[in-house]
Amino acid sequence: IRDYDRALAETEAFLPYINNWATCDCFCPKVFAKHKKELLVPIRRWLDSGEAYTVRYGMEMLMRYYLDDAFRPEYLEWVADVRSTEYYINMMRAWYFATALAKQPDAALPWLTEKRLDLWTHNKAIQKAVESRRIPPGTKQLLRGLRSRS
């Protein structure tokens, strides 16, 4: 779909039917890449929806499109502010922060050094970052020392 408005409408119609992480993570209209400013409005709505895979999709879009040139530090806060007991939401939060460590280390690292995330997300983000090939060895060593037990 090449038209942004139509792609957004179709995405919004499809989101309530997603019931697994694979479907959630594999679809993304290419036209979204050309409309990053406009896409922030539905992303905020998705993050606040309370629906597990809609929330996950919002985080996925932030991870996909807003950790490079379009990055702003408040996007880290948007993801960190999502509170849920849903495993697949929390896993995406950790994945987002691990990816942010690779792409925006100066902004993301303080979230871990200052222990600003909940314990599970903190440790899972460290685990995913340490497993990543995109994180330099020195950063991995630092991250290992930041693991927390409580």
Positions of the model-derived regions?
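Alpha-helical scaffold domains
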Residues: I1-S150
